[in-house]
Design a protein with these regions (language model features):
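N-terminal hydrophobic/helix-forming segments and targeting peptides
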Residues: 1-352
Length: 352
């Protein structure tokens, strides 16, 4: 297995809901420790820059968020089932009957099942009703709250994520796993760093935390950085299986998505046009999107007068327990970022 495939598998499988991204941070630090200076902060934002800084050179920020949508233990019921709340944007019907990992007080991952009232005990009205988080519990197989606390070592405030180990389908060049929003972007940041260690720019890279609950990690990290431009990788939701053809803007295997607008930011139009033109020049497929919803770390960086673009890698079924993404889209996203960094210069950036 080559290093790229292993990197994607490892980042996808890593435990890292918003607020508990430690495992992802450790993966990143280990990955680039030979080429970068690395450190983190108390929020577990991970900072990476090349050991040989170039004085008076352009500084480019590469970012992806380390967290995934997950859950947190809210309360333990007397019968041993667990009430929980979502971390990030979930549709509750997508998680019923799924397995989760609960990181207990000893740092062990305990398996549990997202349970709802069995159909045998539901009235006709409830069978057709809306599923809400208040209707769901996590069941670890315990029969009392005491057992949950003393035998499973599970407490209020423990973090959870879907129990999914990423798989690679070599024949079709696709990945099936969890947390591609934005672990596929985390892997891309690592790949770009490995390809650009000799580039004539200063590269700052971050894996920021708590994006799924309000871009809190980037709001902290950006105050420690002073880039001239920023590229934010995202695992963007693919729309090709439910939109009309003319509205499809992030299809699987059609290239990375460059986003003009979402509810958190308007892109730097001159930087965006530069990236699109360069992609066409290099025969790098890209898709362009305008979104009425959504929000990313770019919504933070551009407020600090930093021209920013989003390079999105399409993910089918983002914010669910399982997603699908394409190796081809990943490769083209990495290639585009590398080409931008290799070709851009200070004069061009001043024009943004």
């Amino acid at each position: 297995m080559n290093s790229k495939i292993k990197r994607i598998l490892d980042f996808s499988t890593a435990f890292g809901p918003s607020g508990m991204e430690d495992e992802v941070s450790k993966l990143a630090m280990e990955d680039v420790k030979d080429i970068c200076e690395v450190h983190d902060d108390t929020m577990r934002n991970t900072y990476m820059h090349f050991k040989q800084d170039k004085e008076h050179k352009t500084t480019i920020l590469l970012d992806a968020h380390a967290d995934e949508v997950g859950f947190i233990v809210q309360a333990i019921k007397p019968n041993g089932t667990i009430r929980f709340l979502p971390l990030g944007g979930w549709d509750p019907k997508n998680i019923v009957s799924g397995e989760v990992w609960i990181l207990n007080d000893k740092g062990e991952k305990i398996s549990g099942i997202v349970a709802s009232q069995p159909v045998h005990f539901l009235s006709a009205e409830k069978r057709n009703g809306k599923v809400d988080f208040d209707d769901l519990v996590i069941d670890v197989g315990a029969t009392s709250a005491t057992e949950v606390k003393e035998d499973f070592h599970i407490s209020v405030g423990n973090f959870m994520c879907p129990a999914v180990t990423c798989k690679y389908d070599e024949a079709h060049k696709i990945f099936l796993g969890k947390a591609f929003d934005c672990r596929i972007g985390c892997a891309a940041v690592m790949d770009v760093l490995h390809q650009l260690k000799d580039v004539n720019h200063n590269i700052e890279a971050t894996l920021t935390t708590q994006e799924e609950v309000g871009e809190r990690g980037m709001d902290t990290a950006i105050k420690n950085l002073h880039p001239n431009i920023a590229i934010c990788f995202e695992g963007c939701p693919s729309d090709d299986t439910f939109e009309q053809d003319y509205m499809i803007q992030s299809a699987l295997k059609k290239g990375p998505m460059l986003r003009w607008f979402d509810r958190s930011y308007i892109t730097s139009p001159r930087f965006m046009r530069y990236a699109i033109d360069l992609a066409h020049e290099k025969n790098n497929p890209v898709q362009e999107s305008v979104r009425k919803g959504g929000g990313t770390n770019a919504g933070i960086t551009h407020r600090y007068n930093i021209p920013t673009i989003i390079i999105g890698i399409p993910v089918r079924f983002a914010h669910a327990s399982f997603g699908i993404c394409s190796e081809e889209d990943y490769d083209n996203a990495v290639k585009l970022a590398v080409e931008i960094i290799k070709n851009i210069d200070a004069e061009t950036i001043r024009g943004f």
